[in-house]
């Protein structure tokens, strides 16, 4: 399993415009590095890539050994998700992780809250400021 191209294309350019806008500054999609250049920083944090370092327990940056993995844990779409992957390839392949993974992050709770307000027709600027705009502030994205 892997992330879809539609999912990747849904991320805005850092200036807040969609990639299909001719003035967006979209670099292109010949290589993964091009696709994630100048995009919403959260995309770079989600998609596993050769340049993404892992931070290990002692705080030392380690090379991303997992980005070069092959076999069952490598994405068939070419867009591998960082979530639930471990930098140690042997542990990842064995499916014997001893780490406590987060299932719901606070960011997801905020997004669920905003979506519920949108579905109920009660989404106001105040709701956006308490949910989505809080997340956008963390990565210096423009407010909605």
What positions do the PLM features span?
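Acidic/polar-rich alpha-helix caps and helix-coil junctions
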Residues: 1-144
């Amino acid at each position: 399993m892997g992330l879809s191209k539609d999912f990747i294309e849904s991320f805005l350019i850092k200036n807040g415009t969609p990639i299909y806008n001719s003035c967006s500054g979209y670099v292109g999609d010949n290589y993964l590095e091009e696709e994630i250049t100048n995009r919403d920083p959260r995309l770079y944090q989600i998609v596993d890539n050769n340049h993404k370092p892992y931070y290990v327990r002692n705080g030392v940056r380690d090379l991303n050994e997992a980005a070069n993995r092959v076999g069952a844990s490598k994405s068939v779409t070419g867009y591998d998700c960082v979530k639930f992957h471990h930098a140690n390839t042997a542990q990842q392949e064995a499916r014997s992780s001893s780490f406590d993974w987060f299932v719901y992050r606070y960011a997801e709770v905020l997004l669920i809250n905003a979506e519920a307000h949108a579905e109920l027709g009660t989404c106001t600027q105040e709701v956006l400021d308490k949910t989505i705009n809080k997340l956008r502030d963390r990565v210096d994205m423009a407010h909605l």
